């Protein structure tokens, strides 16, 4: 058997990982502007944390979770999404306590796991970014969080992004709509896919979310959930729409959008873009006011979203958006002979301690090969170090672009490399 990575996983190699780091840094810096702090939760959770919150009838739980019994016979699952673990942590660590400032804003970046057919931008191990805001039922919280996603896509330069918006209303509104949907779909049950027939009485809203062609056809004339909103749900949704208008964030009201997780209520949304005539959801989320109490905490309003990093990077690549990846080093030390080995090590360490990026030759290669490496690394400066330089404790440094050279003592290099760069016009 060849030792290879498991199906649906990837190795993010040097060079490619620099793109990830750039995007993650943009995300972290933006979230700081909105006063979000990072939370890190375990990669695996008790099975019930996910199954009870995400929903027993969802595809995630019925088809996609990696779950197993550990050596203590505990039922464990690799986390398939980030919200349920964060809510579990919020309750377990009593972050709802009065001394914790509200709203409590947290974000995460980490691996998630789902057993599904691998395709571009969708792997079995994937990386998700998410934000969760606890303690505010103000519609402005919904809009600020949506605006943060919009802000991120602007910062990254992503084009043709459309915001799809809907409301699932209160639990009472949702229950009334659930019954209306059952009444509408039951007479045409046989026209639905097998999965949707099974779900019809368990959770008919899942039929709206189905990607099967027969289901899409069946729900074309289905009743709209917006017709079943109670007065307070309608007022909340109207306020969200009004605030988005005020911020000049365009949106499409999409009444067939229900999201793939069962814990949402009131506002739900997706940011969608087109790649090669295919619609891709790049960010999705909504309000989940009942989830904290479901985990044993007090009634707590909450709002959040998640987005996949693989999909985000795929879109950046497909749209030809250049990422400003720094791929230069400040100094390359060409080492001539074993006599210069220790001096090269000592100088490199001294310059690194001053905050500069340094590489050197370790392989005893010919000088031409070493200069070629310096060009490959985009070195700003080249130092050529041999036995005569070690004896004199002076060495020449060359600007790799202009070819200007200066001769500098080891002592000056070890204490003031920045002034050496200035002498070379850098």
UniProtKB/Swiss-Prot annotation:
EC number(s) reported in the record: 6.1.1.21
Cited HAMAP family: His_tRNA_synth
Lineage of the organism: Bacteria, Bacillati, Bacillota, Bacilli, Lactobacillales
Domain of life: Bacteria
A Pfam family annotated for this UniProt entry: tRNA-synt_His
Gene3D superfamilies per UniProt: Anticodon-binding domain, Bira Bifunctional Protein, Domain 2
Name of this protein: Histidine--tRNA ligase
Gene transcribed to yield this protein: hisS
One Gene Ontology CC term in the entry: cytoplasm
Cellular location(s): Cytoplasm
